[in-house]
Amino acid sequence: MAPKLTALAEFDLVEAQDFYAPKGAWVLDHFMNSFADEMDDLERQAGIHPKHYGHYCMSVPHFPFSVYYDLEDETPIVKAVLDNRFGPARIAAHFGPIWVTDMPSGN
């Protein structure tokens, strides 16, 4: 099934466009074409990517961005499109608190 973007993922994509737009129309076009190609691939390859921060994670080739998604009834739901140059804490915070249930005991 075709991927669906959440409102937050759409906002992330707008931020990415804002970053690339001043660098030239061809750079922005290349980024958007690469992203569109990855969305086409995601339709066929959903669920094969490793999980990071509790979500499947797929890289966008040629650009330092990753697409974080979940599967709902075999439909990929894109939760975020994030710059890989963000630190791990910022990426994790994007998704809210992650609760760890299997904490080793201190005894």
Each language-model region and where it sits:
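Enriched for short, Lys/Arg-rich terminal
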Residues: 66, 70-107
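Basic/aromatic recognition patch in beta-strand/loop cores that engages polyanionic ligands
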Residues: 36-37, 41-77, 81
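Alpha-helical interaction segments
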Residues: 8-10, 21, 53, 58-60, ...
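Generic structural signal for secondary-structure transition and capping sites
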Residues: 18, 25, 40, 44-47, ...
